[in-house]
Amino acid sequence: MRFKLFALAFTLTALCSERVLSQDSAGKEIEGIQHSFFVAGPSFTGIIDEEGKETWNSGRAGARDGFVLEDGNVLIAWGDEVKELTREHEVVFHYKKSAENGELGTCARLANGNTLITELGVKPRLLEVDAEGAIVVEVPLKPETDNAHMQTRMARKLANGNYLAPHLLAFKVKEYSPTGEVLTVFKTDLEELGGREAENWPFTAIRLSNGNTLVNLTHGNKTVELNPKGEVVWKVSNEDYEDDPFADPCGAQRLPNGNTVIASYAAGGDRVKLFEVTRAKEIVWRYMGRTGFITSKCSRRTASPSPGTP
């Protein structure tokens, strides 16, 4: 069986010291799964190649979000600023958080050239910032908590012009209009998911091409796909595995082949930090190198952007 993927590499035979592995459920190596990826984590922010080697280091760990752009530059959000860096570390875009708010949580380059950013704090808001660093769109957010760190994380702009934001302590993913009106609410404290006791805090929310929404639920240690009515149509969690690969999953990405890549932030030691799972819940790729990641973006062999939705 041969897959054409755009993500992390896991080839135990290629580089055991870097803990890269690509196997099927029977332990047989799957030929063709070779990925490099951008990663934002507490000890490293940069690019790792398909053999598990670090090929580019941003120079600053602890990033919250990031993307490899079409031209090879890297857009990164830290808690206090967003930068676009060339591979030579030249800063070509910079936004510093406002003095009134406590931290930043999102960065994404939009089709119109603006950069999507979320600010968390006394004035939680979603921003579009132009190439010169000027705020051109401001959308007030309703996270239902004053805890800045837990207000929202990876927000994204939708094809219809609205915005999708996960609100952790509200146990909700909300779709906002450009004026800040809440249009749709997806609840993550559903009884079938364990209710609030399961701490299904939504961290990543991605609108898929089929209209469903992919959500990583951090402390709940699960990933779910919700239909437009908010009903669970797919779920994968530690209940499906013996080795508990979910450890505070934060970032996620749906690949073009339909598989999902999940980042386990709290994984340490030899535990799985990143893994790729099929619709049938078979894990076909794993990375067990550095400490856990907040997010990762799967890329082609040259660390260029993947067409998969992150």
Task: Name each model feature, range by range.
Residues 23-310:
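Histidine-/acidic-rich catalytic cores in large beta-rich domains
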Residues 18-22:
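Sec/Tat signal peptide C-region and signal peptidase I cleavage site
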Residues 4-17:
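Bacterial N-terminal signal peptides
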